[in-house]
Amino acid sequence: MQKGQRPSTQLRFLIIVILVIGIFFRFFNLSRKVYWPDETFTSLRIAGYTKTEVVEKLYNGQVIGVEYLQNYQRLNSEKGIWDTIKGLALEEPQHTPFYYLIARGWAQLFGDSVATIRSLSAWISLLAFPCIYWLCIELFNSPVTGWVAIALLSISPFHVLYAQEARPSSLWTVAILLSSAALLRAMRQSKNIAGWGIYTATVIVSLYSFLFSGLVMIGHGIYVFAIERFRINKTVIAYLIASCTGILTLAPWGYAVTANLAQATTTTNWSGTKVSLFILLTMWAGNLSRLFFDSGLGSNDSLIKLLPLITVILPILLLFGYAIGFVIRQTPKSVWLFILALGSVTFLALVLPDLILGGRRSGVARYPIPCYLAIQLAVSHLIATHITHHRRQKLWRIVFIALLTGGILSCTISSQAQVWWNKGPERTKYNPQIAQIVNRAAKPLIISDAKLDIVQSLGYLLDPKVQLQLVIEPNIPKIADNFSDIFLYRPSRTLRSGIEQAQGYKTEPAYQGSEIWLYRLSK
């Protein structure tokens, strides 16, 4: 493929069609999937509340309605932007505030329904298309690669899923692509101060989108120093100034992280939960394959369900390996080194602690996004090169069509689902069925001592007639007898046994899967 070669009319038409399909899936059925606990925290932050004050108001044993429960997920005149920032700083300092401030402004303009809040991520995700095209032009000087990259990104099941989630992942994806393209542009026009100013601005946006952007910055730094042969010249100095400016700009939030480090550690300690190497490998393979194909299965599913997918996952992983090797062999150092630097720093920062200390950080699908983008760049260039090479056009066109078809099928299936692997199925998998059972009752009451985010997630599926009685373990509520049906939702052993022993109720499963989340009370 010649540098600067333009795509054919047929290829351009195909990719435009794929792009339209990808955009459609980003906005289709936005409110279909469960609003999972992590997303309820997004709404909590947008509303300006802290978890502590909401628990204090709700978990007191008083009977409340669903509307009252959900009031703390909605905007109100009592809370402002400062409350959003304060809530993040105190309870989730590992999350930088840029996305949440944008989301609050979005909610003020368009409303705070599930579809509206999620649509912000969908709109932001559209910015990734021009950004990845620009990056391909700067990196490969190849419009064909840029068009192929747009097609693969637009219909990628992984990126479509996170474009429909009320979390910062889409914003971070755009920030990574934008800062990477801006860096290459600034290096190419090293004497242009404006170029480095733009890169500085993208670094600030990246850092305030997600703290792991620091790893992307390190990758950029390795690339700059290596390309400049570790000499301190104008390009290196300009990069250092841009990076230091970004870090200094982040200093106020760095203080918040330091001041509330214990809270950040407590909130994220789940990622340090030890898992076997086999589970870790399964998570890596599953996450990587979801760039092009997604069956909906997660790492917690049984091996019997996962085994048949090897016939799909293995070829995709082999394609990734071949693409990386192809780029290293066939492109200049300035190209392949950038791809390796972009992906490897984040990869090593996540994988090494897991292998040495134990944990599952590297298996969290949204953390290695820089790695995914590096792989997608390599695959895009591999396909773009071969579909314009006459000897191998037919084979690689088949590969290209297969990847696009896999993405379309995956997005079609996932768009109809209420629970998917990215919606915390270990916390939400039975909620749709549970909500149906409760909503069928004439005058139902739900009693629970489950965590706030768990209860609020279920609340989005409940009818307004449903009443709730929430307590903090080991408290046992006094149950009124003016309800047609009384349910226990995900009760602790203390709550269940306390109600049985102290108030003479019998508990029996109202819905039973592999775990029992809902009990019905009777006397």
What is the predicted function of each stretch?
Residues 131, 151-155, 161, 171-190, ...:
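Specific aromatic-rich, kink-prone transmembrane helix
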Residues 182-199, 203, 215-247:
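Perimembrane helix-loop-helix junctions
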Residues 337, 359-388:
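Hydrophobic/aromatic-rich transmembrane helices and adjacent perimembrane loops
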